[in-house]
Amino acid sequence: MLQDKGLSESEEAFRAPGPALGEASAANAPEPALAAPGLSGAALGSPPGPGADVVAAAAAEQTIENIKVGLHEKELWKKFHEAGTEMIITKAGRRMFPSYKVKVTGMNPKTKYILLIDIVPADDHRYKFCDNKWMVAGKAEPAMPGRLYVHPDSPATGAHWMRQLVSFQKLKLTNNHLDPFGHIILNSMHKYQPRLHIVKADENNAFGSKNTAFCTHVFPETSFISVTSYQNHKITQLKIENNPFAKGFRGSDDSDLRVARLQSKEYPVISKSIMRQRLISPQLSATPDVGPLLGTHQALQHYQHENGAHSQLAEPQDLPLSTFPTQRDSSLFYHCLKRRDGTRHLDLPCKRSYLEAPSSVGEDHYFRSPPPYDQQMLSPSYCSEVTPREACMYSGSGPEIAGVSGVDDLPPPPLSCNMWTSVSPYTSYSVQTMETVPYQPFPTHFTATTMMPRLPTLSAQSSQPPGNAHFSVYNQLSQSQVRERGPSASFPRERGLPQGCERKPPSPHLNAANEFLYSQTFSLSRESSLQYHSGMGTVENWTDG
């Protein structure tokens, strides 16, 4: 009776070597007898009912050869097969798409089955993709030892397998010949054919014994060529359109395909650092004073751009590295002193362009109070007396200084406003506030020199530690106020404390005067015993008698 049944188009029945088909059927004959009482619920030893023969006949037909398997999503597999299915293989293992899913019927609900898959070479050729088609490139490489992928639910009863689709979506393909994870090992650019095996489990819930019965089902549309990257763009399109995990490659509509744009690299990956540079670069080009602002993080927090707009600066590490201009003309800007000693910087970014038209922004915008850590080094009695205007050494304030013309009325100075070349270099910062003395006769010991600014702290500066030289600008301001309190017969009292340095051409006798001041420092008489302490050291009152 069993030999008269024909196989379906999509399934083939195989039997392991052993007894003949009739003997295998005879060996399976006791199973219906055991299953019949369970199905009918009759007690053992009772005579069979009238329907027992019908149940036994139905159970006899549920043998391994009667199992039918249908491929899920067969139409999708056919689309891939017509284009030439490709499956990606990687060292870590890659899942198949479309996934191998089947619908199984015709099993014995009480019998346990094991479902497994193996993938075998479809031919003995190696392929290459050329001229938009697959061509034979040579002889196939030696096949790797075949591996079987057993479904995780195995072994299970026929009722379990027939209840729902049987999915092998966790199966992974690899090209790692030493793979320890049980993935199926394949060679790239070779054609393979998956096969589904249904094996009846033995008494030990295993298979492989001499009398094991099994059947194999092969679907030709599931054959594929293993690749490390997709070769045919049609396959790429089909995968993107149908794979639910490829939504990121689609447009707003699922049917809108963007493969051409992906191939032309119209979606570049832009890092955050590049975006910061692009956002900051327009601000850098519009504000020429960003260079001095990069000295310390404190300066970035206390100072703003000069264009009148309150711009929000980024963190120092977010700014591009090359923000200093390559060339800078010192005659175009007033700026505070900036000297470098190792890695320390003194940046007081209070500058204003000669060419800049008068703006509506107040002068408080350009004169900022010193940073908090600078103020901590000053004496408490003099911190309140140091004004931002004195700290920045900015001249050209206009009508506030009598006898000094505005910025726009004077030509640019040949050097900077502080005459750096007139003072010999020191190991650290030497920021000095110079008083401008009106033209008048000097005492006798100054008759050999021309009129020049006083340098009140040269003697004190020689004994100052280099680490505290950053704050000499505040010291000198305090010392100038001390001199105002002390008696002096040579200098009139009507001279007020200047707001900054006066721009004038450097005197030809400047160097000689400096040397004379150095030599006369300790020879001058000092009459006051009152000493004023600051963050830089001790300065005594001078008399010019």
Swiss-Prot record:
It holds the Pfam family T-box. The keyword Amino-acid biosynthesis does not apply. Residues 482-505 have a biased composition (Basic and acidic residues). GO terms for molecular function: DNA binding; DNA-binding transcription factor activity, RNA polymerase II-specific; RNA polymerase II cis-regulatory region sequence-specific DNA binding. It is found in: Nucleus. It comes from the Eukaryota. One of its GO terms (biological process) is lung development. Residues 71-251 bind DNA. Its main location: nucleus. The modification Phosphoserine is found at S507. InterPro entries: p53-like_TF_DNA-bd_sf, T-box_DNA-bd, T-box_sf, TF_T-box, TF_T-box_CS. It is linked to Ischiocoxopodopatellar syndrome with or without pulmonary arterial hypertension: An autosomal dominant bone disease characterized by patellar aplasia or hypoplasia and by anomalies of the pelvis and feet, including disrupted ossification of the ischia and inferior pubic rami. This is T-box transcription factor TBX4. It comes from Homo sapiens. The gene is TBX4.
